[in-house]
């Protein structure tokens, strides 16, 4: 997976010049909503943008593993924001802080009394090749209907 959109930039710039601010806002709303839906499904399936499963949980000190899928409530917390110049999809507040630890596999102290813990990388947000194709298809469909 790569978040590199360099090959799409010239195409997107030409399209951007043809649309007015209201049309750009509608397009950005449509793109962010569609991508949020895809990302929600992917998080619920416990997969990263590459399609690989998340790293499983480690055993605790007693030797048992917590039951249930990680990030069960997370899809509900995925937010979108858009205007004529941008479309954003991500998490806000404390959820964003926690997810950054998982996204990049950081080492933190879960609470003040515990030792530092290294979290494995569990990429929850990012663009897959399918997402890029979805963006292209949505833009084409939008332009055909305008």
Residue locations for each model-derived region?
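Short, Lys/Arg-rich flexible segments
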Residues: 1-146
């Amino acid at each position: 997976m790569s978040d590199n959109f360099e090959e799409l930039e010239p195409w997107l710039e030409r399209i951007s010049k043809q649309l007015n601010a209201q049309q750009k806002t509608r397009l950005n709303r449509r793109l962010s909503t569609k991508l949020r839906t895809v990302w929600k499904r992917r998080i619920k399936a416990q997969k990263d943008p590459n399609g690989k499963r998340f790293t499983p949980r480690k055993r605790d000190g007693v030797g048992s593993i917590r039951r249930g899928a990680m990030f069960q409530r997370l899809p509900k917390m995925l937010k979108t924001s858009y205007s004529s110049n941008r479309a954003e999809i991500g998490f806000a507040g404390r959820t964003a802080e926690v997810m950054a630890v998982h996204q990049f596999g950081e080492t933190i102290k879960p609470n003040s009394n515990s030792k530092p813990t290294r979290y494995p990388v569990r990429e929850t947000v990012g663009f897959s090749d399918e997402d890029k194709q979805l963006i292209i298809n949505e833009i084409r469909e939008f332009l055909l209907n305008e």
